[in-house]
């Protein structure tokens, strides 16, 4: 049985973020703060996921902001210009899940 654990790290450009009000007592919008925290903890999070996949004896795939994602995003922007980048990332995640289901038994 083929198994995989996958994750996405798609860094949305600042100008495409759907800005949310700051957390109480802060001045930075929530979306910027979240983006900063993901950037700051990228290696830690990735290494934890790799470690978990190794313990589960599964493959591990991390999808990032690469040409495949850019092509997918451009397609979405042309066909559905009203869809936010955040939602495109979520649709991309579903697409990758479907793609992996063609290869793996468990995802």
Which role fits each region the language model picked out?
Residues 1-92, 99-103:
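N-terminal anchoring/stem segment of glycosyltransferases
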